[in-house]
């Protein structure tokens, strides 16, 4: 589960700075410390155009230099990776998340599919809460839930990371510096992307829009794949393959979260991280012939976001989640190791 409600801030509870002037040309955005991106196609960073300069005086002719090697062409987007459209607003985010979750379920082993096939996904429209969790309702039926605040955060991560990857900007740093202080101190704060973080000239670039869509999908894929695994791993104790039930109403979410907290522990969270990323990588491999191949990067950036929140919180309530959940900074290398283990067993 990924709660982040002030003053009680939890991270992925059954899931889960400052802006500095960029030199010209701006540096390429860097991944979390120690992270080596998985192999695969990535858009090359695009430098800003060089300023116009007057031609230099002609040099005195000399011996002709040896010819330089022919430049290597930039990698082209594979034919199976079409440009994707924009995901705008809660309805689009929710529909996309449901589609991703269905794809994850389809790539589970048959025994796990049977346990979770009918589990509903529901959303709390509260934008002030950043949270996702798996639970059981009052009738003992399983469900998975997420909040609008979580989808706002994932969209902002996707929008900024796509921009940085393509254009060498630092919009993710600017975004986290802008929102983390409020999220850990103000009940009215939201994780939505503030206006002006992404430069206007990049906003409508179709490559940026498509890349943001891909990052959104693999981030919600890890997030809700983690939640789904709490059911088929038996952590909730209520997923037995029963027919789909009616998901709980949003007003009951706080009560369900509170009642679930005593059962949460670091072993379950670590197991769900591993199962969730394995499911995501299985689905990514299965779709790679026709679409973008999902990987663990979305989970890594989500953990990085919560690690920055942890750093911004100081002595406030967010630190308390480490009593029942692995520290997000620790989860980054563990998730990397989980993904490396999957690749060792699934070469190619």
Give names to the regions the model predicted.
Residues 1-16:
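Sec-dependent bacterial lipoprotein signal peptides
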Residues 18-39:
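Bacterial Sec signal peptide processing site at the extreme N-terminus
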Residues 19-21, 38, 62-143, 147-152, ...:
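C-terminal capping/extension segments of zinc metalloprotease domains
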Residues 34-55:
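Composition-driven detector of proline- and glycine-rich
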Residues 135-217, 234:
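Active-site scaffold of zinc-dependent metalloenzymes
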Residues 186-202, 231-258:
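A structural motif
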Residues 210, 214, 254-261:
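A short, mixed-charge helix-start or loop-turn motif at secondary-structure junctions
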Residues 215-229:
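Short alpha-helix carrying the canonical HExxH Zn2+-binding catalytic motif
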């Amino acid at each position: 589960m990924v709660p982040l409600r002030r003053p009680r801030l939890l991270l992925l509870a059954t899931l889960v700075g400052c802006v500095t002037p960029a030199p010209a040309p701006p540096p390429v955005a860097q991944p979390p410390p120690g992270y080596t991106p998985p192999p695969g196609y990535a858009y090359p960073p695009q430098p800003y155009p060089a300023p116009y300069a007057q031609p230099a005086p002609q040099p005195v002719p000399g011996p002709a230099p040896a010819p330089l090697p022919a430049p290597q062409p930039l990698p082209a987007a594979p034919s199976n990776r079409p440009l994707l459209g924009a995901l705008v607003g809660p309805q689009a985010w929710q529909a996309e998340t449901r589609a991703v979750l269905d794809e994850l379920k389809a790539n589970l082993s048959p025994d796990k599919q049977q346990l979770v096939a009918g589990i509903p996904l529901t959303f709390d429209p509260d934008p002030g809460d950043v949270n996702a969790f798996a639970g059981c309702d009052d009738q003992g039926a399983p469900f998975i839930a997420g909040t609008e605040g979580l989808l706002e955060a994932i969209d902002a991560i996707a929008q900024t990371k796509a921009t940085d990857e393509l254009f060498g900007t630092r919009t993710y740093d600017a975004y986290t510096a802008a929102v983390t202080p409020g999220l850990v101190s103000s009940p009215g704060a939201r994780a939505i992307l503030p206006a002006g973080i992404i430069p206007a000239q990049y906003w409508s670039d179709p490559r940026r829009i498509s890349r943001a869509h891909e990052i959104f999908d693999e981030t919600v894929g890890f997030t809700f794949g983690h939640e789904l695994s709490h059911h088929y791993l038996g952590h909730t104790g209520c997923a037995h393959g029963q027919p789909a039930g009616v998901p709980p109403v949003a007003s009951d979410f706080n009560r369900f979260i509170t009642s679930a907290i005593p059962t949460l522990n670091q072993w379950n969270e670590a197991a769900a991280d591993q199962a969730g990323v394995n499911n995501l990588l299985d689905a990514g491999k299965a779709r790679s012939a026709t679409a973008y191949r999902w990987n663990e990067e979305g989970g890594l950036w989500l953990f990085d976001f919560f690690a920055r929140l942890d750093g911004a919180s100081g002595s406030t309530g967010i630190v308390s989640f480490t009593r029942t959940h692995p520290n997000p900074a620790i989860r980054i290398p563990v998730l990397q190791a989980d993904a490396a283990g999957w690749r060792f067993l699934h070469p190619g």
